Design a protein with these regions (language model features):
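Core catalytic region of metal-dependent phosphoesterases/phosphodiesterases
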Residues: 1-36, 110-111, 134, 139-150
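Proline-aspartate-enriched helix->loop->beta-strand connector
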Residues: 5, 80, 105-122
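Active-site environment of divalent metal-dependent phosphoester hydrolases
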Residues: 13-20, 49-54, 89-93, 115-137, ...
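Short, well-ordered beta-strand micro-motif
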Residues: 35, 43, 152-154
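Binuclear metal-dependent hydrolase catalytic cores centered on His/Asp/Glu-rich metal-binding motifs
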Residues: 37-79, 98-107
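Active-site-proximal beta-strand elements of phosphoester/diester hydrolases
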Residues: 38-47, 82-86, 143-148
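Short acidic, glycine-rich surface-loop motifs adjacent to enzyme active sites
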Residues: 75-94
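Contiguous, function-dense segments enriched for cysteine-driven chemistry
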Residues: 93-100, 108-109, 117
Length: 155
């Protein structure tokens, strides 16, 4: 990586190559919970879609199964600090049919109350309204941040 900090990632809808050849010096947290310096970080990759040839396109039902499995892992410890996903939660910056969020992520918001939700997939220049253009959304106690391109966030 370019900065002296760890890099955690999840798969996006075009990341088939990362699955075959993971980037060096990075840690994939897709479908797992990582503890880093006292922070509990969970990751879920993929986006809305139903292309059976693309493992990173998921229906709402398939993602809901992944959320439930992740919540089983989270129940064994304290609350979630950071949620990292490729797609947003439904209603958080949605635009086209392909660029929709998952409703089941709201279950994670309710049950596990992440302080921060970092996501990508949505291109901010294609959205209307100040929240969407800035890419920062407040969903109850959770701050959801569109990290498309890049973001520097101090924790």
């Amino acid at each position: 990586t370019m900065i002296p900090a760890p890099l955690f990632y999840v798969y996006g809808n075009h990341d088939g190559n990362y699955a075959r050849n993971p980037p060096l010096g990075c840690q994939c947290i897709d479908g797992t919970v990582a503890d880093f310096m006292g922070l509990r970080i969970a990751g879920l990759g993929g986006c809305m879609g139903d292309d059976p040839t693309n493992p990173f396109q998921l229906t709402e039902e398939r993602m809901e199964k992944r959320v439930k499995k992740l919540q089983g892992d989270l129940r064994r410890g304290r609350k979630l600090d950071i949620l990292v996903t490729h797609a947003p939660a439904a209603g958080v910056g949605d635009s086209t049919a392909f660029h929709q969020g998952f409703q089941c992520f709201h279950q994670l918001y309710r049950d596990n109350v992440p302080t921060l939700h970092l996501f990508g997939h949505l291109h901010r220049q294609n959205h209307h309204g100040p929240e969407a253009r800035q890419g920062v959304f407040q969903v109850g106690p959770t701050k959801a941040v569109n990290c498309t391109g890049y973001r520097i966030i101090e924790i």
